[in-house]
Regions:
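N-terminal domain-onset segments
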Residues: 1-61, 70, 85-211
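Alpha-helical solenoid scaffolds in large eukaryotic transport, assembly, and signaling factors
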Residues: 73-75
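Short, solvent-exposed aromatic-acidic interface loops
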Residues: 78-85
């Protein structure tokens, strides 16, 4: 399983971006707008000029932000329950040691500072991932496993969260960034037919569709 001890299962940054958008699109399709506050995944294609951001939460103690920029990609995660006192959190200087300056600027964003950090992972070339693993538990195994690029992870997530048995082929299309159609929505959530609401949600996260 992916963790800061073994990053070999993380997809490349381009695949990761599609996968993250797909997770956010899945939440839009499965959870109506009036219940959007319970969604676990959101995506902002215009987080900063030329930069995009994916936000994830388990609804409790674990949170993660993935930042995509021309200079590379940074993944920051935290489990607030791992430490009794804030001063026991890992030093950000230790977590980012060796990180290129351009990516360190992303780590200084107000969203990351507010979230705090128990781990961070980065890539400059979009393929090779780096981190400075801590000796203590850091929640990376739980959080990174949700963005492994595998459509089956979507299916397992759906069984637990919605709950629903999501069709693998429909889920695979979301993971691959295939435009959402009415047929795809119906395959995932037969009860969902608020087309304008879905369209607006997908437009907001920059996910392609044919609605």
């Amino acid at each position: 399983m992916i963790s800061t001890k073994d990053l070999s299962g993380l997809p490349n940054a381009e695949r990761l971006k599609n996968f993250c958008k797909g997770l956010a699109a899945l939440d839009i399709i499965m959870v109506e707008e009036e219940w959007s506050f319970i969604r676990h995944y959101t995506y902002n294609p215009a987080w900063r000029k030329g930069k995009e951001a994916f936000f994830a939460t388990d609804g409790s103690d674990q949170s993660m932000i993935v930042l995509f920029a021309p200079e590379g990609c940074v993944i920051n995660g935290v489990d607030s329950e791992l430490y009794d006192w804030e001063e026991k959190l890992p030093r950000i200087e230790d977590l980012t040691d060796g990180m290129p300056p351009a990516l360190q600027k992303l780590m200084s964003s107000r969203e990351v500072k507010k979230m705090k950090s128990t781990f961070c992972v980065w890539t400059e070339d979009g393929t090779t991932w780096h981190c400075n693993p801590m000796d203590s538990e850091d929640a990376s195994k739980d959080l990174l496993s949700t963005i492994d690029g595998n459509p089956l992870s979507y299916v397992e997530y759906g069984k637990w969260f919605y709950p629903a048995d999501l069709p693998l082929e429909a889920v695979r299309q979301l993971a691959d960034g295939v435009p959402v159609t009415k047929e795809l929505v119906t395959a995932l959530n037969p009860k969902r037919n608020e087309w304008e609401e879905i369209k607006a949600g997908l437009d907001k996260i920059g996910y392609p569709h044919e609605l």
